[in-house]
Amino acid sequence: EDCRRQRQMCIRDRYYDIYAKYMAESWKYGAVDLPSDFTSNYKKSNVYAYRFDWDEQNVYLGVDLPNLLGAAHGMELAFIFKSDGLLGESSDAINDIMYNENNRSTDLELSTKMGQYWVNFAYDGNPNSAPYDMSTEWKPWNKLNNNERFIVFDSVNDKGIAMFNNTLSANSILQGISSESITVDQKCNIIDKMFNRTTLTDEEVDEIYRTFMSGKCTRA
């Protein structure tokens, strides 16, 4: 109904949202949670993890880009380095699609703060102070006692900048997929895509297929 009222082209298939959710979760688990646990424990050094959540693109030709693209991979670089498109100093097809002029001030506020964290870290390995004092402390990853582990970067129009602790495990992801109200074939397709490229051994992947939904999925 909202799509028709706003004359937007919407992704109506709920499977798209479910598929995107678990692809993102598997990426976070394998590329952030696991290595952060290992590095912070083994090396006894501070690890700073983040999630970029900005999704305030324009609706372009009726396409809901905030839903279709969201905070896509690498998009935070424009904010860290304050790109010309973000500043409104470069107008081309991509920038006009990506950045909503009505959100310019909040985009720039987020960009400035992100850049300051990065400068601080480059200065002395601590993103929180010198030369810039930051109002939200970016705490190092700590897997003990359910501590806050990573910072989320978003504009004040949404979550803003804040620390979070929702970490993932392989079991939590697989259980989530299993509990979704989609077909078995769709669940198996998600599993196939998740393990299409993996650092797990063939034996480990085979064991996952054997145990997931009582072996209803066949490895592609």
Predicted regions and their residues:
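Alpha/beta-hydrolase
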Residues: Q8, A20-Y22, D55
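Single conserved hydrophobic/aromatic residue that forms the stacking wall/gate
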Residues: E1-I11
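Flexible glycine/proline-enriched surface loops and loop-helix/loop-strand junctions
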Residues: R14-A20, I97-E101
